[in-house]
Structures are given as structure tokens and as C-alpha cells.
Amino acid sequence: MLVWLAEHLVKYYSGFNVFSYLTFRAIVSLLTALFISLWMGPRLIAHLQKLSFGQVVRNDGPESHFSKRGTPTMGGIMILTSIVVSVLLWAYPSNPYVWCVLFVLVGYGAVGFVDDYRKVVRKDTKGLIARWKYFWMSLIALTVAFALYITGKGTPATELVVPFFKDVMPQLGIFYVLLAYFVIVGTGNAVNLTDGLDGLAIMPTVLVAGGFALVAWATGNMNFASYLHIPYLRHAGELVIVCTAIVGAGLGFLWFNTYPAQVFMGDVGSLALGGALGIIAVLLRQEFLLVIMGGVFVVETLSVILQVGSFKLRGQRIFRMAPIHHHYELKGWPEPRVIVRFWVISLMLVLIGLATLKVR
């Protein structure tokens, strides 16, 4: 929005030309989202406390979690608000990729909001009925997937980028829709499963978003895309603004979510952030890269799948509790140790993922 205004004002003062620089807008997008979230934090927390929107804790969870009961939840509202406002201010409104991310972000945020509302108001730990949650998540994912397929079929926008192989980029055809669906829905749920400890989900999200900001910049630059042997996508550059907004909003939220947390993001935050990372990976054609950089989310999800599968097939559990971060808690690891070690692993995976762009 401000970019368009600056384009009209540049004729009166050349200094407004700085708004056309992607790097400048990326930095101010991060700072805008950061300051909004820091400003909203105390106010939202106080309001949630006034409404008694406190966290509902499972009775079969680790005993250390019982002290979290009543901590304000639905803090994801401040994350979403910060991201949306920052993106609308600093990204080109005419860019379709930006609107795809906002559509999934807000859509999944709405699903998460309803889920959280049922938990905190009706005191129902299950929240929104699972089939309805997946119905709405699937509808949102399929809507954007079909739209992208119709507008991009037969172009690099629907190719599959395979790590380590620079000349292997097959056209997916209609399978693009299926892949996009699983990536968006899967990532939304993966981040949701990871959000079980103070700050555990938000920092990996920030790191992955930061990694995708670099990838988006390279993908939207013809010279760098050619150098890295990845598809050049002319709309991809503006995703840098979206990614840096996620980083800024995430860091602002972490200020209040770090151990011991003053607020939890709730499903309104985790589903939205996961869906956003998923659609960003789809738009950049970097689904495999998401698996690497978001390895913490992948492992958390696999631990649940393996735990449920093992119990149903063998009547035995693999882990003391799933997702796997609870397993380490029950082994006696202090919560901060689990959190920081997962952060370190996430940072390593993001760096490894970025390195694969060159190893081709």
C-alpha cells in the first residue's frame, strides 16, 4: 500500500524511491510486525485474562504442565494482526502470491480461532470437531491449490524442484494440486502439534520463515535463480516481505511466550503459521526444502503417527508420550532444555536446507 503511495510521491521527492527497494521493505516489514506485536502483547494478554480465556491443560499430560492451566491463550491473534498489517503496508498489493499467503494465513487462523474458542469458553479440551477442522482446512488448501494450478499449469510454477539434482524438474500436472494440499494441511497440523512448550513452535517458525525469505529473494531474481538452478518466478520476490513479517511478528510474540510463558499462541496462531509456511513452500516450489528446514515439525508429526500406529498394531507405545517433546520431558529434561535444544536443531536444519540449494 505504501509502495503505491511512494510511487506517486517520488516525483516530488526522489528519496521516496527507497520504497521500491526490496531489501528496505523487507527490513521495515520485519520491524513493523515486531513493533505491532510488542505493542499489542500486554494489551491482548490483559484482555484475555479479563475474559478468562485461559489454557486448558490435559489431565494425562506431564505434571509440570498443570501450572500452565489458566495462562492466557489465543495469543496468535497478535501474530496474525502484526503479519497482515505489515504485509498490507509494505508489499505490492497487486502481487498474487502475497494474497495467496494471506488467504491461507487468515483462513487457517479463523479455523484455529473457532477451535480455541470452543476450548476456552466451553472448556472442551477437544475443541472443534476433528472432521470439521479438516474439512475447512482442506477446503482452504484445495481452493488455493486449484487456483494456482489453473493459472500456472505447464509453467515453472508447477514444476517439482528436487534437491541435489539441478536438471530434475518434472511437470506435476494435476498432481500439483494433491502435493500442494498435503503440504499446506500437513504443515498446518505439524506446527500445531509442535506448539506444546513455551516458545517451542515459534522459534523454528521464525527460522524457517527467515530461510524462505532468502529463497524467495533468489527465486524472484533471474540471475540468482539461474545460478542456483531453481525456477525463476517473477512474483516470488514479494514473498520476502511476507517472510520477514512472519519473522518480526514471531520475535515479538516470543517476547511474551518465552519460558515461563505469559501467553500461548493457541490454534489460531499455530494453524495459521503452519499453513503460511506450507503455501510459501508451494509457491516457491520448495516443498522438499520445507521438509529439511522444518525438520523439527516433521519429527514431531512422525512421533505422533508412530505412537498411534504402534499402539493400534502392537498395543505398545514407542515413546513415553507424543509428540516427542513430551517424551523428553517425562525422561526428566527440564522444559527450557528441551526448548533450546529443539531451537538449535532447527537452526542447523535451516542452514543445511539452504546449503542444498547450492549442492546440485
Swiss-Prot record:
GO terms for biological process: cell division; cell wall organization; peptidoglycan biosynthetic process; regulation of cell shape. The keyword Methyltransferase does not apply. Pfam families: Glycos_transf_4, MraY_sig1. It is a multi-pass membrane protein. It catalyses: UDP-N-acetyl-alpha-D-muramoyl-L-alanyl-gamma-D-glutamyl-meso-2,6-diaminopimeloyl-D-alanyl-D-alanine + di-trans,octa-cis-undecaprenyl phosphate = di-trans,octa-cis-undecaprenyl diphospho-N-acetyl-alpha-D-muramoyl-L-alanyl-D-glutamyl-meso-2,6-diaminopimeloyl-D-alanyl-D-alanine + UMP. PROSITE patterns: MRAY_1 (PS01347), MRAY_2 (PS01348). It is found in: Cell inner membrane. GO terms for cellular component: plasma membrane. Belongs to the glycosyltransferase 4 family. MraY subfamily. Catalyzes the initial step of the lipid cycle reactions in the biosynthesis of the cell wall peptidoglycan: transfers peptidoglycan precursor phospho-MurNAc-pentapeptide from UDP-MurNAc-pentapeptide onto the lipid carrier undecaprenyl phosphate, yielding undecaprenyl-pyrophosphoryl-MurNAc-pentapeptide, known as lipid I. HAMAP family: MraY. NCBIfam families: mraY (TIGR00445). This is Phospho-N-acetylmuramoyl-pentapeptide-transferase.
